Design a protein with these regions (language model features):
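Metallocofactor- and cofactor-centric catalytic cores in central/energy metabolism, strongly enriched
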Residues: 2-84, 89, 93-125
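A very general structural signal that marks isolated residues within well-ordered alpha-helical segments
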Residues: 87, 133-134
Length: 134
């Protein structure tokens, strides 16, 4: 389901060597690891330490020793990673990155369904929801 940096090496040529070196230097200095979603640009995947889907990346972050997680993805991915890694710093390089699926249901919709069908109605979702919805 996920791949490590090795799967992105063919795209690394598009990233200048001095840029890659600077990224490695900053990662070391700030005790950081870069996680990238499959949907981000190939150049970002090329410099990421891990590439995968949102749930994999959030879980993976918990197993990594670095204290700073740079999550290249959309808002809910950063939120999920932070929920699972409260003791770590989670950075989202593009805070405006968004996923339309994360907005397909609102808190008001869930509350309305509970009002109609009862409070014991369970709302089930994959990780594609923002925190205000859950």
């Amino acid at each position: 389901m996920a791949q490590t940096r090795g799967g992105a090496l063919e795209r690394a040529a598009a990233v200048p060597a001095e840029t890659r070196e600077r990224i490695e230097e900053l990662k070391s200095k700030r005790d950081a690891v870069i996680l990238a979603h499959y949907y981000v640009e190939p150049e970002v995947q090329a410099v990421a330490d891990y590439v995968g889907d949102s749930f994999y990346l959030a879980k993976l972050a918990k197993t990594l020793p670095q204290q700073t997680i740079v999550l290249c993805g959309v808002e809910f991915m950063g939120e999920s990673a932070k929920l699972l890694n409260r003791d770590k710093t989670v950075l989202l390089p593009e805070p405006a990155a968004d996923c339309p699926m994360a907005h397909m249901v609102s808190r008001a919709t869930i509350d309305g369904a509970r009002a109609e069908y009862g409070d014991d109605l369970a709302a089930v979702s994959y990780t594609h929801l923002t925190l205000p919805t859950t």
